Amino acid sequence: MRNSLLDVADLTTVFETSNQKVIAVNDVTISVNRGKTLGLVGESGSGKSVTAMSILRLVSAPGKIESGSITFSIDDTSIDLLSESDSNLRKIRGGRIAMIFQEPMTSLNPVYTTGYQVMEAILLHKKMSREEAKQKTIELFHEVGIPNPSDRIHMYPHEMSGGQRQRVMIAMALSCSPDLLIADEPTTALDVTIQAQILTLLRQLCVNRNMGMIFITHDLGVIAEIADDVAVMYRGNIVEHSDVLSIFTKCKHPYTKSLLLCRPMLSGNIKRLPTVSDFMETELQDDGSLKILEKSVSDESLRRVEEKGRGRHLYPLKRLAQLGYSALRDDYEEGISCAGEAESPLVSVSDLKVHFPVRRGIFSRVSRWVKAVDGVTFDVYRGQTLGLVGESGCGKTTTGRCLMRLINPTSGTFMFGGIDISKMSQSELRPYRKRFQIIFQDPYGSLNPRKTIEEIITEPMRFHGMGVSRQDRQQKALELLEKVGLPGAQYLKRYPHEFSGGQRQRVCIARALAVDPELIICDEAVSALDVSVQAQVLNLLKDLQSELGLTYIFISHDLSVVKFMSDMMAVMKNGRFVEFGPSECIYKDPKNEYTRELIRSIPNVNIEQIKSRQNSQI
């Protein structure tokens, strides 16, 4: 049997407009073998997804495949996918080559049950009765680890968790026993525990079914867990292609090195994350090609400085004991006890509860209550960062929005600067609102697409009566853009769609800073960003905190990011804190089993595990 499933040679895909021609994929050559996984890694815009769509010939206008060949093996017969008719290609898509997309909620049809949608794919490609297709769907749900599959096939997408929806997408992709599976960022939107389960599932299915897989991601930590071979893409080009062990032990290209080091690590304490620009710079040549120049990198230039403590940002030991959090490491207690004993907290939360009613019946009677936040107590001191971490649905975002008074609490109190704001009316609260701001998760959805950047940044200034004139507000907007790394008056008249994801998030940060707040709540502020852009934004947030004395509540499901940003950390589960203390202590010596599970689930570059996986497949 031919071992190579797919051979892509010299593939070039372009997008042509009346003004310019953009080369999205440039002379890409890759191959995928049966039972093996090729990891395709790079930033957004590097050409990963366009490569996948080109393989399936799904690139829509104004894009087109300009040159190259795509050879696919079916039953020991090689066919050229670029020359196949549309009717034959439709049989191959879904039947022989299947694809899993990033966001299952938008990929699944909300008006049909999940079981119906999987059955539909089976009936399209296989000669089966509806009853046989239903039984096959139940078997697939069981194979991908969905509990009670005979009941779950009748559930709609919104009735399932994110992890279960992604498992449905995997079941749909596997429904016709494909030879090749293309997984496009299938775990990016998932919590670390669910992500670990999905990676394990995909790895097992690939081996058990002798199926080839292309796994697309921007996270090399995920690549270490699942890939056999790795192709690193940068601006449409493959800049490095090797087996997974070589990528992590002796990578050659500066872009690969930067991706490896941009991720926050669990081991050690660093003040600053390196970025791509620390490793290389690019020059545009006369012929339109890109020349990459490697920089000489030193520990000093990256400022990866080990810290032995965080001085003024530590937590008063006496206050921790009062709150009931006494499980601390002995070597940390002295540092904590000498910090901030006389200082009052900026934010003080006591027994906060937020319960949502579930109504049923024609009279909408309350049948039960969902306890989203169920009695949390904590303090945040000036200049400090508190990290809230946990899985989706644990109550992190509800806690943050309640502190912003975007949601009213069911009970409990929270003080801001010594003043109880938990029971204030909206008119009473208005003078205080400029003292605390929020940065939302999605930089695409949180900016008004109809307003210019100037209007977006100056809007909160006008609302709070700041600035004598429009010129004053415009000047401050310019200063804020420069502060967040977007200098130049030309940015003011642009609209959000003209910016990249990282630039949009910088605009969101500038807007939050517009009213000179004391507290900023960062609600999954970097989870939608690539690791390299994420590093830039995290560094920016730290710089602003140091310069302006800001206080952060940093909400995330990514424990490594929370550890990098936070002085103190609260681990949430089912609306409660299961662990609270200095972030370094929690990582070094977690007391709760749930915290240990979260730490174990973080994608990790373990060289011995990679070697073991390679040896087991020889």
Regions found by a protein language model. Give the residues of each.
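Conserved signature/switch motifs of ABC ATPase nucleotide-binding domains
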Residues: G94, H158, C176, H497, ...
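Short catalytic/signature loops enriched in Gly
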Residues: R2-S4, P147-D151, V244-V347, V358-S364, ...
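A short, surface-exposed alpha-helical micro-motif characterized by mixed small hydrophobic
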Residues: I223-E225, V562-F564
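Conserved ABC transporter NBD signature motif
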Residues: I65-I79, G412-D420
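ABC ATPase NBD coupling module
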Residues: T77-A98, S246-C251, F363-S367, I421-Q437, ...
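A short, proline-enriched helix->beta-strand linker immediately N-terminal to the Walker B motif
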Residues: S175-D179, A514-E518, Q534
